[in-house]
Amino acid sequence: MPITSEDLHGNVPDTAAVALLLIDVINDFEFENGEQLLELALPVGKQIAAVKSQAKKAGVPVVYVNDNFGKWQSDLNKIVSHCLNDGVRGEPFVKLVLPDENDYFVLKPKHSGFYCTSLELVLEHVGSRSLILAGIAGNNCVLFTANDAYMRDFKLFIPADCVVSETEEENKYALKQMEKVLKADITNIGELDLEKMKNVGPRMSADKHGSGRELKQG
């Protein structure tokens, strides 16, 4: 079992080489094309719930990285309550992916989970250098978060069956771009071994001559 501390950071394990980021899964789908996206998202929600369950068993911290709905005063309870109690489209999806008490939650004001948030500090605290990204939308907030993670030299796993966009074509294109440009592993979640992933080393970064070198830790 992972060791947790007594301080304010203790919602996640103190040492975890890999973390699971769930991006914009607490979602009301009350926007243009939201109904279309929801239809594609519901089966993906079941996959996300499955990977979260696997992560918990493997001692991998789960971090909800969620839009603040344009309200800086928003918090986790308000957002979840809105999605469950206000008759919004996203209620059946959110019920699949509800956070647990010991999950971490980061509110973001823009597309990337790293922009103006505490996400990088959380990941630094637990020592995660590899990230599993899942959520909505593959060609938008998942892509922007993946890009910023790559710029910070994180190793990326973005299971193709745990990401959804407004159309299947847009989703496939975004995944291929993340695989090609950001060196992401887009293997379906059923083919990934979270226990082995906990021991994955840092991403290789190209030096000025283009050759790979291992990034130093600490």
Model-derived segments and their meaning:
Residues D28-E30, G70-L76, K95-F105:
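Short, basic/glycine-rich phosphate-binding loops at helix/coil junctions
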Residues P61-V62, D67-H82:
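Early exported N-terminus immediately downstream of N-terminal targeting peptides
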